[in-house]
Regions:
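A short, active-site helix/loop in glycosyltransferases that binds the activated sugar's phosphate group
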Residues: 132-176, 183-190
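Aromatic "clamp/platform" in nucleotide-sugar-dependent glycosyltransferases that forms part
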Residues: 301
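Conserved donor-binding/catalytic core segment of Leloir-type glycosyltransferases
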Residues: 8, 203-221, 227-230, 247
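Nucleotide-activated donor-binding/catalytic signature segment of Leloir-type glycosyltransferases, i.e.
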Residues: 70, 258-280, 284
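Short hydrophobic beta-strand element within catalytic cores of glycosyltransferases
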Residues: 318-321, 338-341
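N-terminal subdomain of nucleotide-sugar transferases
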Residues: 1-56, 90, 456
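Extended catalytic core of nucleotide-activated donor transferases of GT-like folds
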Residues: 8, 53-151
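C-terminal amphipathic helix plus adjacent low-complexity
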Residues: 352-457
Length: 457
């Protein structure tokens, strides 16, 4: 029986963004079930106008003899005309789009036209509460929604049940699924580092404790709070030990979307050894960085999932996180003696409410910090919580990890890896299986739209 063909709309899977990386992982993990065509997005794509058939290379990498993957590079995420062309040329069985729904308003404008022939699928993440009821029309435009975080699953279930408008239909069970990001355990894993790797970053300097931050230098990632938290931690150490700890940052030092980290360090971090990685790294190199670190930190005020800390735990390195968005899914939170599930979040909403949930039982591999919530907004996104932490509270958690032995930290990280591969469900295999199950359900249950739909007013 011929495989179904999926048209994927997302970042070019050859690129380095988080969306591109996840796209690549689930495409490679499901090429035995589906043929893939990607409208491969990038800003001012250098390959615009070309078509790339990656099938032979994918066959070598995966061992799937009939793997079929084709890319159409494009400037941005697309438009109505190119979708119509690809529907005619490639004749896919479904369209799957991935990232913030605000990028896809043009797609939702033609959803009725598309859904006369193929289902429209959405791999979805939403950063925070309150429930974004302004997304209701977007959800109505999709036949199936795969939710990347448990919080997103709860949000989507609740918003989808809002029936204010007569044309809105309540989602059927198959239409909303939990499809967590999965980390490739064959790439991110505990290893013995090559002798020269540490020297390539630190020279001959040896550190007793390395805190690692791997994020874009943008405002919501809170890089300055990380710097100030580390400085506060260092000031609490005896003077003779201050030179033996460092903050390793894998990011741009100056970014218009973030800040000038060099000036911040010069003015406010006189006691800190802050070192920036010297280059971009392959996935293997990123795994080296996680293994080099003692702890990885992410205290972003909005975070859909947080790939860096998830990769860190899979590599066996423990973490510090802000209890926000998808970062919660990496903690192994428990209530009433069981791990929280996606269905639990329909009622809970989010654990970011400090008054209700601070101190919730969690895995040994993480030290979570509960935020204070404020509400931000814009015209397209009228309201969303902004979950901020106090950098002084973060410094306390850094000290807690520091006071443990390296062996204790490593043991905690390895427990996290085992949990992710098991009950945590954050393995690559689970992402691909849940993605396939969702797609199969959509293909099986899809009912093409009629050309016209009659509404009685």
């Amino acid at each position: 029986m011929a495989k179904k063909k999926i048209l994927l709309l997302s970042d070019d899977l050859r690129m380095a963004s988080g969306i591109a990386n996840v796209s690549k992982q689930f495409v490679l993990g499901t090429v035995d079930k589906y043929d893939w065509v990607q409208l491969a997005a990038a800003i001012q794509h250098p390959d615009m106008g070309k078509i790339f058939d990656l099938s032979a290379e994918v066959q070598k990498v995966t061992g799937v003899e009939d793997a079929n993957v084709k890319l159409y590079p494009y400037n941005g995420y697309g438009d109505a005309d190119v979708i119509r062309q690809l529907l005619m040329i490639e004749q896919p069985d479904a369209i799957l789009h991935f990232t913030d729904p605000r990028y896809w308003i043009w797609l939702y404008d033609i959803e009725h036209e598309i859904r006369q022939s193929v289902p429209l699928l959405f791999y979805h993440i939403w950063d925070d509460l309150p429930d974004p009821k302004y997304n209701r029309d977007f959800y109505e435009s999709c036949d199936w929604i795969g939710c990347i975080s448990k919080q997103t699953y709860g949000i989507t279930k609740r918003v989808y049940s809002w029936d204010k408008e007569p044309q809105w239909k309540t989602a059927k069970d198959w239409q909303v699924s939990y499809v967590p990001h999965g980390i490739n355990s064959n790439i991110y894993k505990p290893i013995e580092l090559p002798e020269d790797f540490s020297k390539s970053i630190f020279g001959d300097k040896q550190y007793d404790f390395i805190l690692y931050w791997n994020n874009r230098n943008i405002r919501r990632k809170q890089p300055v709070d990380v710097l100030l938290a580390f400085e506060e931690f260092v000031k609490g150490l005896p003077e003779e030990k201050r030179d033996k700890v460092c903050l390793l940052m894998h990011t741009t030092q100056i970014d218009e979307n973030g800040t000038d980290l060099i000036t911040t360090i010069e003015h406010h971090c006189p006691n800190s050894n802050v070192i920036f990685t010297p280059q971009r790294y392959t996935e293997q190199g990123l795994n080296y960085l996680y293994n080099l670190a003692d702890v990885t930190i992410n205290i972003a005020s909005n975070e859909g999932f947080g790939l860096a800390t998830a990769e860190s735990v899979m590599a066996g390195t423990p973490i510090i996180i802000n209890v926000t968005g998808g970062l919660q899914d990496q903690c192994g939170f428990e209530m009433d003696g069981k791990y929280l599930t996606a269905d639990d979040y329909i009622k809970i909403g989010s654990l970011n409410d400090k008054r209700k949930y601070e101190g919730t039982k969690h895995g040994e591999w993480v030290k979570p910090i509960w935020p204070v919530r404020s509400t931000a907004g814009s015209i397209p996104t009228p309201y969303i919580f902004d979950d901020r932490v106090d950098y002084a509270d973060v410094s306390t958690l850094i000290r807690e990890w520091y006071d443990m032995s390296r062996e204790e930290r490593k043991a905690a990280g390895l427990k996290g890896r085992a949990w992710m591969l098991g009950e945590g469900g954050l393995s690559l295999e689970n992402m691909c299986n849940t993605m396939s199950n969702g797609i199969e359900g959509a293909l099986k249950n899809f009912q093409p739209r009629k050309k016209y739909e009659l509404f009685t007013v």
